[in-house]
Swiss-Prot record:
Pfam families: FAD_binding_6, Globin, NAD_binding_1. It catalyses: 2 nitric oxide + NADPH + 2 O2 = 2 nitrate + NADP(+) + H(+); 2 nitric oxide + NADH + 2 O2 = 2 nitrate + NAD(+) + H(+). PANTHER family: FLAVOHEMOPROTEIN (PTHR43396:SF3). The keyword Metal-binding applies. One of its GO terms (molecular function) is metal ion binding. Residues 152-263 form the FAD-binding FR-type domain. One of its GO terms (biological process) is nitric oxide catabolic process. The record marks 84, 395 as: Influences the redox potential of the prosthetic heme and FAD groups. This is Flavohemoprotein. Residues 149-404 are annotated as: Reductase. It comes from Chromobacterium violaceum (strain ATCC 12472 / DSM 30191 / JCM 1249 / CCUG 213 / NBRC 12614 / NCIMB 9131 / NCTC 9757 / MK).
Amino acid sequence: MLSEQTRSLVKATVPVLQQHGVALTSHFYRRMFEHNPELKNVFNQGHQHSGQQQQALAMAVLAYARHIDDPSPLLPVLTRVAHKHVSLGIRAEHYPIVGKHLLASIRELLGEAAGDDLIQAWAEAYGLLADTLIGIENGMYGDATSADGGWSGWRPFRVAKKEIESEEIASFYLEPSDGGALPAFKPGQYVSVKRFVAEWGLSQPRQYSLSDAPNGEYLRISVKREDAAQGKPAGRVSNLLHREVQVGDVLELSAPQGDFFLHEERDGPAVLISAGVGQTPMQAMLGQLLKRGGREVRFLHAARHGGAHAMGAKVRQLADRHPQLKVHVCYETPRAQDAIGVDYQAAGRLNLADVKGIALLPDADYYLCGPLGFMRAQRDSLRGLGVAADRIHYEVFGSHPGDD
């Protein structure tokens, strides 16, 4: 428990964090990587170069300072962070390194304003946060290790099959190199994949949703090749996977993690809403729902056009075999060869108000995944159509769709 004085000192830094938070976290990462360069193999260097990670950490530090009197509302966020940490192999021994450089960065940036009392207050606050995360993560590591077919750390997998799904998405079917069992993960979860990037001289982890239901034979990831666009550099790891990785190659994987997953204990309808590569966790959910049977399923998907639409034929075949599955696909800019009524059902952007007859079902759970703008629009649309907040489950690849 933090003292009132400690909490007051931490809260007093909120205005500074609002104004200079990104400067602080940018300085922190530069400092930490200079003194502990081995950690570059743990952190996504693409996010470092884009500034995305610095921005995310600045927002997290600010949120913690604002909630220092009662951090309990942050528990869902901390749980999400812990899942990510476990997938990256972050352990208790990493926290003192982070704390050392965070406190040093506060002192170096604030100068005389960062007196000993303030540094001590933040040391205590960081210690409490670290202990909380370590406790959550230790539980997750234990669960991953004790599960049938589970493991901790990195496990080698052989690429048994590589399948081109669209102009920009490829699927990799991965079998354990050790011939061992696989865990019954929760559909919607992800794994971290580690690949050496020669250009940087670093191993780099990336998170990819598992795109097929648990089957005991393989894990499947479906990776979008991130091309350079609008000043944004190409994705190093996704391009390496597309260009270099072939059948027979070996990839290192973490055990499945993530707090976005299908609620299998419920028996009402499930409505899966996605855009682009955001359909990958939905594919795992869809496969599991149809395998188990007994629930109405809706699969709503938005793509730019048929060339970018992955797994469309597979979903159509599933709909032909399973009458409880209804599919609605929107192409924003369909090509001449894209057949309406076959490849897609509507042109333009997905508007749930236009498909209420398909999408709105009593007692349904709604699962959303896609780009941030898409996510906010679908979430707001569902709320406007009367869907309760606790029936909407979502995952954004990148940022969280919270209010600005």
